[in-house]
């Protein structure tokens, strides 16, 4: 009853958890169901366990995911094993910390589209149009401070190991573009166009651009792709996304840079 009272009147509720254990796997679907029943847009952000955590934990996570999908409007999945695929020498304790940081950035990337004013601001209705009853979703993140930072940041986000799926049939995408005050509207529009070219022409794309002076000369792109199929096909990113020929940065280098920024 106390939890129900806390959720009453909320417009949007994030339920974050690590699936596979007892606490998150058992409680997250219940909380999500209560939040949705209270009328809130309910978005779950869940990590799937590392293979090193064992088969039983993996099976528990899959069962919990099915319950979570039926309870929440949208479930954003963060597959922990993808971190180790591209950085197999990453210590497991650091991998858990990176996974938690990604989960936090996923929530922050969505909420800042509403809460922070910027070049292009969104409201709750915009978020709901993408996240409401959209099923499965995944997230990609990228950033760059190069001379072609806009295209490089979106390329990195789309080729992120966390977004290792075919997004061509996704029903929607939420794009958060952040940069310092020298970021231009033209750069933001280039990022959105690259994402649009990867999706179905009928997909609903909502984007916002925020000013964050702590990023200095860097542009950070966060993409949440919703309404995806559950196939495991890789999302192919080609060099045609760049106006000029660019040397592709390996996923391992991208992850190393990301980890360096966290620790």
Would you name each region that the model predicts?
Residues 1-263:
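Tubulin/FtsZ superfamily GTPase core signature
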